[in-house]
Amino acid sequence: VDWTDAERAAIKALWGKIDVGEIGPQALSRLLIVYPWTQRHFKGFGNISTNAAILGNAKVAEHGKTVMGGLDRAVQNMDNIKNVYKQLSIKHSEKIHVDPDNFRLLGEIITMCVGAKFGPSAFTPEIHEAWQKFLAVVVSALGRQYH
């Protein structure tokens, strides 16, 4: 992927403003609520039977932060995202059997949470476009090891 200087700057500046402890839990909770079939991958997280249970589930919140930590690795390694996610892609493909489209869904929800948090003055169309490109590369890398 070729990144322009403006895209790199936009992604890094936006990332620097994101509170992973807020956006991560929000996004993963919303994924589990809006797309309930994704819950099957989180059976070990305890009670996720209702929206309130999901929103109050500490394991969901913690895993949301973990997901955002994975995005941090991508932000820090924008020229090597495929390799950054190679082992994680294998794990999600061969061990957890996650539908790779779920990565796209989560990326869309993360984008909605970020957009709602910062609004149009900070999440401008240019920043949004760079962010979408970044997440598309991440989603592609996560799906790369699927057969």
From Swiss-Prot:
* Record Gene3D superfamilies: Globins
Instruction: Give one GO molecular function term.
Output: metal ion binding
Enumerate the InterPro entries for this protein: Globin, Globin-like_sf, Globin/Proto, Hemoglobin_b, Hemoglobin_oxygen_transport
User: Which residues of this UniProt protein bind heme b?
Assistant: H63, H92
Identify the tissues in which this protein is expressed: Red blood cells.
What are the recorded Gene Ontology BP terms? hydrogen peroxide catabolic process
Q: Which key words are in the record?
A: Heme, Iron, Metal-binding, Oxygen transport, Transport
Span of domain Globin: 2-147
User: Which cellular component terms (GO) are annotated to the entry?
Assistant: blood microparticle; haptoglobin-hemoglobin complex; hemoglobin complex
Which SUPFAM superfamilies does the record cross-reference, listed alphabetically?
Globin-like
Homology family: Belongs to the globin family.
The job of this chain, per UniProt, is described as: Involved in oxygen transport from gills to the various peripheral tissues.
Q: Indicate the quaternary assembly.
A: Heterotetramer of two alpha chains and two beta chains.
Its protein name is Hemoglobin subunit beta
Instruction: Write down the species.
Output: Leiostomus xanthurus (Spot)
At the highest ranks, the source species' classification is:
Eukaryota, Metazoa, Chordata, Craniata, Vertebrata
